[in-house]
A protein has these predicted regions:
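Conserved N-terminal phosphate-binding loop of PLP-dependent enzymes in the Aspartate aminotransferase
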Residues: 1-175
Length: 175
């Protein structure tokens, strides 16, 4: 039940997605189904690493990730979820390649990377079709919604067949 998330992140309003949201003003209780550890993301304004160059900033955040995995968790972390660009968290854009550097650490530890593309997917970054493409990676799982439905309640999740088939359910739909 251990998850890594990014400080200042927003992942939704359901009980589980509020649990991994990295903003205290969205949390109404501490009784959540996950044990979440928050790591530094692309937010620079009040970050202790904000004064660094892009490469140094990325390296400092990756070092923080390594440290939190080692000392801030029990070690059996399921995944890290991140928005390629934080929307509700202040429209925060990390340096290109940022999540690629983080994914290298996650892969070494056997931790899945989930890209929350609800706000950035379907060409909404203006540069790429998916926000994660700016980081030179393919996430293990990615979620998408707003750009797909154009106002209608549509969403999706994409992962490898191995991951999707590991869920012994008839459906994962919420609609």
């Amino acid at each position: 039940n251990q998850v890594l998330a990014i400080r200042g992140s927003y992942h939704g309003k359901s009980h589980s997605t509020v649990a991994i949201t990295g903003q205290r003003n969205w949390s109404s209780t501490s009784l959540y189904p996950f044990n979440v550890t928050y790591v530094h993301g692309g937010y620079r304004y009040r970050s202790p690493f904000g004064h660094l160059s892009d490469a140094e900033f990325t390296a400092a955040c990756v070092a923080d990730l390594e440290n939190m995995i080692e000392v801030g968790t029990a070690g059996d972390i399921a995944c890290m979820i991140a928005e390629p660009i934080q929307g509700v968290g202040g429209f925060v854009t990390p340096p290109d390649g940022f999540f690629g550097a983080m994914k290298e650490v996650l892969d070494r530890h056997g931790i899945l990377f989930i890209a929350d593309e609800v706000q950035t997917g379907w060409g909404r970054t203006g540069e790429h079709f998916w926000g994660y493409q700016s980081h030179g990676i393919t996430p293990d799982i990615f979620t998408f919604a707003k750009g797909l439905g154009n106002g209608m309640a549509m969403a999706g999740v994409v992962a490898s067949a191995e991951l999707m088939d590991s869920l012994p359910a008839n459906s994962i739909s919420t609609f």
